[in-house]
Each structure stands twice: as structure tokens, then as C-alpha cells.
């Protein structure tokens, strides 16, 4: 689709589930997106960096969302490996 300036724009940019790599469609009202902030361990203050995770409704319906969040944050180094 084109806007008034003649540039091509998308109406909807689909997200992908961070755990299952499925595309989250527009009518998936059970899907969530979490943004976890990085914290400086010495001061306990939040930095400018955040990490976003999107989970589809199918993962949440199966009750696997907490396990997926732990697995993804361990992989990214937010949680320690022995958590």
C-alpha cells in the first residue's frame, strides 16, 4: 500500500513467537509481548537496554509460557545458568 507521499508502507507488521517461531496473527488476542530491562548489578538501576519476547497464545494455552521465558532469558544471559 502507498501513502500520500508515494512511499510503500505496511498496514500490519506480524510478530514471531520467540519460543516457537510461529507467526502471531492479528486475531491472536492471547499473545503477549514482554520487555525485560537490563539492570546494573552494583547499583540496581535499569539501563537503556531492554530485551523483548513475544509469546503466542498457543504456548500460553499449553501452560508452557513460564518455561519458555526462563529458557529464553537463560540463553540471552539475563538469568544465570543454574537458576
From Swiss-Prot:
Q: Which GO terms describe its molecular function?
A: structural constituent of ribosome
Protein's cellular compartments: Cytoplasm, Cytosol; Cytoplasm; Rough endoplasmic reticulum
Looking at the UniProt record for this protein, which Gene Ontology cellular component terms does it annotate, in alphabetical order?
cytosol; ribonucleoprotein complex; ribosome; rough endoplasmic reticulum
Q: Which UniProt keywords apply?
A: Cytoplasm, Endoplasmic reticulum, Ribonucleoprotein, Ribosomal protein
Pfam families recorded: Ribosomal_S21e
InterPro entries associated with the record: Ribosomal_eS21, Ribosomal_eS21_CS, Ribosomal_eS21_sf
The UniProt entry, under PROSITE patterns, shows: RIBOSOMAL_S21E (PS00996)
Q: Which GO terms describe its biological process?
A: translation
- Keyword Transferase carried by entry: no
Description of how the protein assembles with itself and partners: Component of the 40S small ribosomal subunit.
Family note? Belongs to the eukaryotic ribosomal protein eS21 family.
Q: What is this protein called?
A: Small ribosomal subunit protein eS21
Q: Which organism is it from?
A: Agriotes lineatus (Lined click beetle)
